[in-house]
Amino acid sequence: MAPVSIVSRAAMRAAAAPARAVRALTTSTALQGSSSSTFESPFKGESKAAKVPDFGKYMSKAPPSTNMLFSYFMVGTMGAITAAGAKSTIQEFLKNMSASADVLAMAKVEVDLNAIPEGKNVIIKWRGKPVFIRHRTPAEIEEANKVNVATLRDPETDADRVKKPEWLVMLGVCTHLGCVPIGEAGDYGGWFCPCHGSHYDISGRIRKGPAPLNLEIPLYEFPEEGKLVIG
């Protein structure tokens, strides 16, 4: 009887297996049905593709050439405004930097010639530079006029360098490298530059040495007898 019982139980389990499978399928279907949420998604039924906003109504209807002309106009206008502002700024800067009337007045120096004896040199300061004033003797004037201008490095007659023969007025700056020459010295009885050995005659003309030019003549005038104004 034991073998029969074992066979019977096996047959019963085999017969019950389909029923369990049906119950499991039914249970799974029920769970799936009940798992849906009661919350309804606002996107339900919407297409998964994102919609791009249409800004066409905000775009200019003018042709491209018109837009470019407008851009050029704006750039040109801004450039003109900038240039006008820069011009005004530069003009104001230059105005502030220009010398005042007081400064210009100080640029002129007045000299009393009665205080300078004949045959003597006087050195004054004008615009930060030394000015040589020589009260020449008749012999010095004659010597200056005897020089052959054609032999000079920087040809100038004595008459071209003075307004009155007895008064020689010139900047005391060597035309070589800017040193101050020594008066009544050198091989020509005029001025000698100790820096590099330039010799100037009694008219201030270069005669020997490395200097290329004669001593410079500043602006000056004789407003009245016995008075000299430089500048």
From Swiss-Prot:
Keyword Manganese: no
Residue ranges crossing the lipid bilayer per the database entry: 66-95
Membrane topology classification: Single-pass membrane protein
Keyword hit for Transmembrane: yes
Span of chain positions assigned to the transit peptide in the UniProt entry: 1-24
Cofactors: [2Fe-2S] cluster
Disulfide partners: C179-C195
Annotated Rieske domain residues: 134-229
EC number(s) from the headed UniProt entry: 7.1.1.8
Molecular functions per Gene Ontology: 2 iron, 2 sulfur cluster binding; metal ion binding; oxidoreductase activity; ubiquinol-cytochrome-c reductase activity
Mitochondrial intermembrane side: 96-231
InterPro entries: bc1_Rieske_TM_sf, Rieske_2Fe-2S, Rieske_2Fe-2S_sf, Rieske_Fe-S_prot, Rieske_Fe-S_prot_C, Rieske_TM, Ubiquinol_cyt_c_Rdtase_Fe-S-su
Gene Ontology cellular component terms for the protein in this record: mitochondrial inner membrane; respiratory chain complex III
Domain of life: Eukaryota
Cofactor comment text: Binds 1 [2Fe-2S] cluster per subunit.
Free-text description of this protein's post-translational modifications in UniProt: Processed by both the mitochondrial processing peptidase (MPP) and the mitochondrial intermediate protease (MIP). Initially, MPP removes 25 amino acids from the newly imported precursor in the mitochondrial matrix. This proteolytic processing is then followed by a second proteolytic cleavage by MIP, which removes an octapeptide to generate mature-sized Rieske protein.
Propeptide: 25-32
Extra remark: The Rieske protein is a high potential 2Fe-2S protein.
Assembly mode: Component of the ubiquinol-cytochrome c oxidoreductase (cytochrome b-c1 complex, complex III, CIII), a multisubunit enzyme composed of 10 subunits. The complex is composed of 3 respiratory subunits cytochrome b (cob), cytochrome c1 (cyt-1) and Rieske protein (fes-1), 2 core protein subunits pep and ucr-1, and 5 low-molecular weight protein subunits qcr6, qcr7, qcr8, qcr9 and probably NCU16844/qcr10.
Family: Belongs to the Rieske iron-sulfur protein family.
Name by which UniProt lists this protein: Cytochrome b-c1 complex subunit Rieske, mitochondrial
Taxonomic lineage: Eukaryota, Fungi, Dikarya, Ascomycota, Pezizomycotina
Gene: fes-1
